[in-house]
Amino acid sequence: MNENDNNLENETGFSGRLIVVSNRLPVSIKKESNGKWSCKMSSGGLVAALSGLKSNFIWVGWIGAEIEEDDRKEIKELLWKDYSCIPVFLSEKVANEHYNGFSNGVLWPLFHYLPGDLDYDDRIWNSYVEANEQFSSVVAEILKPNDLVWVHDYHMMLLPEILKQKKPDARIGFFLHIPFPSSEIFRVLPCRKEILLGILNCCLIGFHTYDYARHFLKSCTRIVGLETAPNGVYFKDRFVQVGVFPVGIDPDKFFESLKTTQVQNRIKELKESFEGTKVLIGIDRLDYIKGIPQKLQAIERLFQKYPEWKGKLVLIQVAVPSRQDVEEYQKLKKEVEELVGRINGLYGSIGYSPIHYLFQSVDPSELTALYNISDAALITSIRDGMNLVAQEYIVCQTENNGVLILSEFTGAAQSLSGAVMINPWNTEEVADSIHNSLLMPPEEREEKHQMLLKYVTKHTASHWGLGFVKELNKASSNTDKMVTIQKLDIEKVVDIYKQSKRRLLIFAYDGTLIPYNNVPQLSRPSQELLNSFDILSNDPKTDVYILSGRDKKTLSEWFLGIQIGLSAEYGCFFKLPESTEWEQQVPSMDLSWKETIRPLFKYFTLRTPGSFFEEKEMLFTWHYRNADPIFGSIQARELHLHLDNLPLDVIVGDKTLGVRSYNINPLSSMKKVITDTIPKGLDLILLIGDTHIHPSELPTFDGKIFNISVGKKSVKDSYHLSDPAEVNYLIIN
């Protein structure tokens, strides 16, 4: 074990293997003239960010090209031996449609708030699914019980769900390196639900900023209908943690670079070249989200409004080539070059160009020198996940205390409070901010720079990586502890059922026998379910009861002719299997409270579009399933507060709020049934749904009790079924 292994375990408490999954491996491959393959480590943001974690570490990703079957064995051995990497071999078609088609043609523009640029079709979606399938198969093949799987970015949003299907105990985390858009933007995506369900199969989901996490949580509520908390989502029978982890850089790399002779000589050359001139630096990929046209328009406005800067200010704009084969990027390049030409033509002269435009990649030494000699950095992204250029600029400003002018639409803006914040769409504001930043007093420059430097040197790439792994390890351990509710072994229960002498089966209705329906009247039992109950009820050794919030009339019609017991309006009324008559649990009940409740329910129904209420003999139920999920929940909480002040029993259901007299207990009748059945040899009780009885409540019963939760509801000491379909399967058996 090396020093970095100890670092990972000491910092995170995790001693197993970490499997990192990203679209591309951090390695480029090349076939040499002798026919042998060679590999070379590549650079990149994720490579740098994960460098502090390099320990018992496996990286899974695409190799970047289609590889012939005959070469795959050699490449796999080479990558594993030298780099602990495992390649995923995709066909050229799948790779292109997955990466260029769906990931960058659909998800990238949508997540950066440009839904008009979507180019969606089923063909590229199918390739996205196929690529995620192939990645998950590679991970599943190498996965061991104590491993952590860390999935990266928008290319792999289906992988967690697919991997969970193959390996149910997998401990998976997901981190999104780009913004997550508001739910109003995200819902444009045709496959929006599949994407959300894909990453919800994680223990931990990470974002750069609180805004991105909040947008994700709202999408889970609005699109999937899930209940959320500020730090996570209730999904199936567990809590998926959602956290904020702003990524950083490796400052030491830049500090060391600044000390080299090569960089110092270059700094000296650049200072001599721009002596007497203020220098602005812009380093961006040539991408429409980076706001380079907006930056150039602001520079043009600066020269118009403050002509004194002519001849005294230059912008060095590096535009790193990106996706040059895509038409939109070609148009962007043309637009940028035309703006550069126009500004240099209007405000330049012989020997002076206000904009030095470089359409090329710049090596790290040159980049460090450019950062160092600049008086200010200008970042005008119209939407950016984080933007690490801002942090790189800060650590290279060792003497100058340069000013960081930063778009408020970057993720970095939420962390770098010492920057001058701008709205890149407000050309006037950006021009003024440049002017004021270049004239900022030295004391203020130093104060802002020290604030920024303190943050960047603390929140490094290593800090980010170790922090995420630590939280993932903790979240997956908590998930393991939470899963105390056993999945019901249906075959085992059926065997116990067959061996028992007398059984009592008690079912809830909505959400247990039938899925919740936006229109309650449409939740009729299927003919198959009715047939199953008819068969069960004709067995002299079996008693069946259904507990429901429905009224007597509805239940009588639905289960007409079937000899089962029924409880209506959450226990207000009760009917024995052999009877057609309903009994009122509490005779001569005072219902004067209904006159107070009726106007209150009407008031909240009018205030909450999509909601409605039902008035039954002894029960009011307010339904808000069809309301906006967030607003509906807020209104339900407020209504609950009003009801808490009244001497009534409030029943909180799934998107419902019910009210009845406080002296009614739906289990009272059932306990009487159980007590009456015990002398007849009762030795098995199944309670399925949200009604549960602890054995201690039945001191004279010494048989078996199965409390079975359905769906997301979890009760201690109970078993669990996922949905009504599994309940129906149990009944049929």
Swiss-Prot record:
Pfam families: Glyco_transf_20 (PF00982), Trehalose_PPase (PF02358)
Record Gene3D superfamilies: Glycogen Phosphorylase B, HAD superfamily/HAD-like, Trehalose-6-phosphate phosphatase related protein, domain 2
Single GO MF annotation: alpha,alpha-trehalose-phosphate synthase (UDP-forming) activity
The keyword Zinc is assigned to this record: no
Known EC number: 2.4.1.15
Keyword Coiled coil annotated: no
Keywords: Carbohydrate metabolism, Glycosyltransferase, Transferase
Top-level class of the enzyme under EC nomenclature: transferase
Catalytic activity reported: D-glucose 6-phosphate + UDP-alpha-D-glucose = alpha,alpha-trehalose 6-phosphate + UDP + H(+)
GO biological process assignments: response to cadmium ion; trehalose biosynthetic process
InterPro entries: Glyco_trans_20, HAD-like_sf, HAD_sf, Trehalose_OtsA, Trehalose_PPase
Transmembrane segment boundaries: none
Similarity comment: In the N-terminal section; belongs to the glycosyltransferase 20 family. In the C-terminal section; belongs to the trehalose phosphatase family.
Function statement: Synthesizes trehalose 6-phosphate, the precursor for the production of trehalose, the main carbohydrate storage reserve of the dormant spore. Trehalose accumulates in both prestalk and prespore cells and then is rapidly metabolized during terminal differentiation of stalk cells, while being stored in spores, where it serves as the principal energy and carbon source for germination.
Name used for this protein in its record: Alpha,alpha-trehalose-phosphate synthase [UDP-forming] A
Provenance organism: Dictyostelium discoideum (Social amoeba)
Lineage, opening ranks: Eukaryota, Amoebozoa, Evosea, Eumycetozoa, Dictyostelia
